[in-house]
């Protein structure tokens, strides 16, 4: 489990260290940096998948993703006597991300991403470069707890005899996670990489008239709902057959008293139907309101038979009627019994 998240110089976040529990809610007004927290978590997951540099470039490169304010605030700026304005930079340009483990057997990780030195002979002179990486055990990075150290192209691994240098250099555009996750020499790196790859993110479920979740879908065992909810019907049926079918029925009834869901199977196609009190026939997914469909998608995501180590939800309350929020909260709390959960949420009003 993670005990803390650290972000420095990312978009609207100058420096943030946030404690994490089994269930953590990140909330605040618009512009307070909630979305930056979510996107920073996505970048950390991209490191384990080898895509962090590409993701940063898609966001506009370091020039667009770095802290948008001045390097330092003068006393006059803090008092409001003068407007906030840029100052002469005295520190290296660096985006820093990391997290700490909760227990001694958990691993922590940190990365420092900066600008490349002037290299006139390459067309990739604007690509961000990974400057430093570190892995340690437990909640604090100390010389006694550090297990892996990467500085520039040089990688060192710690074993029972001390620090051992790895002969092969690490490219500046690649993480040590993907370049040297050796089960013999660096088992902690391999373990941490697979943990980070298992992190699961849900950001936005489509609920428009053409949303994939409204259409009949190919049916196959689906223990993990797709990010866009394409396989809703198959995911719900998988929960019923190999997951907690009673929890599924209870979650539907908690939000819609007297209602139930059914998965209609027509050949290789699955379709979601919802029975509601007072109606003579079930409603298909195409007929459901946006809020009802989104709630069913959250049920499928949160009651997964294959819970991840970390589940990150971005504004799950979007498009839900206020009456559904208590049931959603209970559903999220139930998911937190199986996974560590981080919820990014906008406060009501």
Language-model regions: role of each:
Residues 1-9, 93-97, 200:
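Conserved N-terminal strand/loop that marks the beginning of ABC ATPase nucleotide-binding domains
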Residues 94-242, 246:
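Electropositive, glycine-dotted interaction segments
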Residues 7-8, 101-103, 249-255:
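Short, solvent-exposed secondary-structure boundary motifs
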Residues 190, 250, 330:
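Active-site phosphate/pyrophosphate- and oxyanion-stabilizing loops and adjacent acidic/basic residues
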Residues 39-118:
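Conserved P-loop NTP-binding catalytic core
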Residues 1-50, 258-261, 266-349:
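Switch/communication elements of ASCE P-loop NTPase nucleotide-binding domains
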């Amino acid at each position: 489990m993670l005990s803390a998240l650290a972000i420095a110089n990312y978009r609207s976040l100058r420096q943030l260290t946030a404690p994490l529990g089994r269930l953590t809610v990140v909330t605040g007004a618009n512009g307070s940096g909630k979305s930056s927290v979510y996107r920073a978590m996505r970048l950390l997951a991209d490191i384990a998948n080898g895509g962090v540099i590409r993701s940063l470039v898609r966001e506009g490169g370091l020039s667009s993703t770095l802290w948008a304010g001045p390097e330092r605030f003068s006393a006059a700026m803090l008092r409001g006597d003068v407007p906030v304005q840029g100052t002469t930079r005295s520190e290296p340009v660096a985006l820093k991300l990391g997290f700490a483990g909760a227990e001694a057997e958990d691993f922590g990780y940190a990365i420092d991403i900066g600008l490349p030195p002037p290299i006139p002979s390459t067309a990739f002179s604007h690509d961000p470069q990974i400057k430093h990486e570190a892995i340690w055990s437990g909640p604090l990075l100390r010389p006694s707890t550090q297990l892996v150290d990467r500085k520039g192209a040089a990688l060192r691994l710690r074993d029972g005899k001390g620090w051992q240098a790895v002969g092969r250099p690490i490219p500046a555009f690649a993480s040590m996670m993907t370049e040297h996750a050796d089960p013999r020499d660096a088992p902690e790196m391999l373990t941490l990489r697979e943990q980070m790859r298992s992190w699961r993110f849900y950001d936005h479920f489509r609920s428009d008239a053409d949303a994939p979740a409204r259409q009949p879908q190919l049916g196959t065992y689906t223990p993990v709902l797709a990010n866009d909810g394409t396989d809703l019907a198959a995911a719900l049926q998988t929960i019923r057959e190999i997951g907690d079918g009673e929890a599924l029925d209870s979650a539907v009834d908690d939000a819609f008293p007297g209602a139930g869901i059914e998965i209609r199977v027509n050949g290789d196609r699955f379709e979601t139907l919802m029975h509601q009190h007072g109606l003579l026939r079930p409603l298909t997914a195409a007929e459901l309101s946006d809020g009802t469909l989104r709630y069913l998608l959250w049920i499928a995501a949160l009651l997964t038979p294959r819970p991840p180590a970390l589940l990150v939800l971005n504004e799950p309350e979007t498009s839900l009627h206020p009456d559904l929020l208590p049931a959603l909260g209970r559903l999220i709390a139930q998911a937190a019994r199986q996974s560590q959960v981080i919820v990014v949420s906008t406060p009501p009003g």
